[in-house]
Design a protein with these regions (language model features):
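N-terminal Rossmann-like or analogous alpha/beta NTP/dinucleotide-binding catalytic cores
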Residues: 1-115, 213-226
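Residue patterns forming the tRNA-binding/recognition surfaces of aminoacyl-tRNA synthetases
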Residues: 84, 93-95, 127, 151, ...
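Active-site cores that bind ATP or allylic diphosphates and position pyrophosphate for catalysis
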Residues: 98, 102-233, 238-247, 255-256, ...
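Catalytic adenosine-cofactor/nucleotide-binding cores of aminoacyl-tRNA synthetases and other
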Residues: 225-396, 459-491
Length: 491
């Protein structure tokens, strides 16, 4: 295969949302698989809606996902003169013309089409102007747009899409479309094609919603005498009601930064978004970076739209269960050395991080994180459910307290258990277990009742990791102190 050059060209009108992120990921994977280049172009020609904040958000989102680009990101607005020059060339070679129709005239044509119950399409009034008529109108100072002159022959634009196969659009169904506004500002349909030609883009990989522009851009390529890239249009991402995912409708819940802030791992997000519209023949679900690059191909992109099962629920089910499962998988199985920086960053946002966790307490901290991560779904769980393991200021779950402390009348025997544990020669699993067995026998308490009460007393939770390991990682002093404190709660 010739050198592959692809691009991601977002408009900086808001944050990076999951639809745009998925497009970027597919382009990045394709470039990396084929040893090609992944370019980043900021399409900022809509000056009124573009913002520096949005640009920064897009760059931060891509960086967080681990998508590196191979150029210095540039702005489409830097090449306005080049876009205008392309329009001039199309005028000169007869592939475009100046249109002097006013807004009122066009509105009248649209209204007439509505009354006739026909689809409005520009009728080519100014296409038939002679050179002399055009000159007179220009000399009179009449404003004009520039329209592309679509062939009037009985034919069609044909696209061999790498996902959807052969696509045809009849010339008769494409109006002479505007490529430059009356104020001289080139439109997206022209700018995008001209930029792709200049950058040598070999594959245009984008959402299905871009398909409407593709026949027009093919005509622009042909009008400028440029070779066509290959096109691959991805299926759309829908919400549970089968509506297209959008920033306007769904808000921050479809923003990449929303998932970063809610404790999702970057690679888990990449893994999930790839599977949201692409699959390998063997249905493999979890990939390392190298595995995914090797496995990815455009033929695996689904033609049917995918559903992102977001929910308005603010609880644990706020997002797609598959995303949660994928994140939990990586959280529980990725090498601890890779996970620790993410844990540190999360804890550092609160009062929970201590420099000692990287020095004299490192061994204890690593073993504790290894113990508790097995039940966690997001990094935020280290801050909430994991708090009791690294800080004495933690929340007691009301349900667990009511069930395991108050109903168990644990206040009667927790202080005595604390005393007996404080007197152990060694506070390690073997001696602790032996003492607990003696205590159970002496007090005639069922093992489950004791374990649940102790777990709630020392962690504030009703469930958790291996009981004996929890005791040992917390250490004698913390366990004893918390048992004594919990005795007051259970009264």
């Amino acid at each position: 295969m010739d050198d592959v050059i692809v691009r991601f060209a977002p408009s900086p009108t808001g944050y990076l949302h999951i639809g745009g992120a998925r497009t970027a990921i597919f382009n990045w994977l394709y470039a990396r698989k084929h040893g090609g280049r992944f370019l980043l172009r900021i399409e900022d020609t809509d000056a009124e809606r573009s913002s520096d904040e949005a640009i920064a958000g897009i760059l931060d989102g891509l960086s967080w996902l681990g998508l590196d680009w191979d150029n210095v990101p540039y702005f489409q607005s830097q090449f306005t003169a080049e876009h205008q020059d392309a329009a001039k060339r199309l005028l000169e070679n007869g592939r475009a013309y100046k249109c002097f129709c006013t807004k009122a005239q066009l509105d009248e044509k649209r209204e007439q089409a509505r009354k006739n119950k026909t689809t409005y399409q520009y009728d080519g009034t100014c296409r038939r102007l002679t050179a002399t008529q055009v000159t007179r109108k220009e000399q009179a100072g009449e404003p004009y747009t520039i329209r592309f002159k679509v062939p009037q022959a009985a034919g069609a634009v044909r696209i061999d899409d790498l996902v959807y196969g052969n696509i045809e659009k009849r010339y008769a169904d494409i109006e002479d479309f505007i490529i430059v506004r009356a104020n001289g500002q080139p439109l997206y349909v022209l700018c995008n094609a001209v930029d792709d030609i200049r950058d040598g883009i070999t594959h245009v990989i984008r959402g299905q919603d871009g398909l409407a522009n593709t026949p027009k851009q093919v005509l622009i390529y042909q009008g400028l005498g440029a070779p066509l890239p290959k096109f691959a249009h991805m299926s759309l991402t829908l919400d549970p009601q089968k509506a297209k995912i959008s920033k306007r409708k769904h808000g921050e819940q479809v923003a990449v930064h929303y998932y970063r802030d809610h404790g999702f791992l970057p690679w888990a997000m990449v893994n999930f978004l790839v599977l949201l519209g692409w699959a390998r023949a063997d249905s493999q679900e979890f990939f390392t970076k190298s595995e995914l690059i090797d496995a990815f191909d455009l033929g695996g992109i689904n033609r049917t739209n995918s559903v992102f099962n977001i929910s308005a629920d603010e609880g644990k089910h706020f997002t797609d269960p598959k995303l949660m499962n994928i994140n939990a998988h990586y959280l529980r199985h990725m090498p601890m050395a890779e996970l620790l920086p993410f844990i540190k960053a999360r804890l550092a946002k609160t009062d929970l991080w201590k420099p000692a966790f990287e020095t004299e307490q490192r061994s204890w901290f690593v073993s504790t994180m290894e113990l508790i991560r097995g039940r966690f779904n997001t990094l935020n769980d280290f801050e909430t459910y994991g708090r009791a393991y690294i800080n004495d200021d933690f929340i007691m779950d009301e349900t667990a307290v009511r069930k395991n402390l108050k109903e168990a009348a644990a206040g009667q025997w927790l202080p005595e258990l604390a005393k007996r544990l404080s007197e152990l020669k060694d506070f390690e699993s073997g001696t602790i277990e032996a003492e607990l067995r003696l205590f159970l026998k002496d007090k005639d308490i069922k093992p489950g009742k004791l374990m649940n009460a102790v777990r709630t007393a020392i962690t504030g939770q009703g469930v958790g990791p291996d009981f004996m390991k929890v005791l040992t990682v917390l250490g004698r002093q913390r366990v004893v102190n918390r048992l004594i404190s919990a005795a007051g709660i259970s009264v």
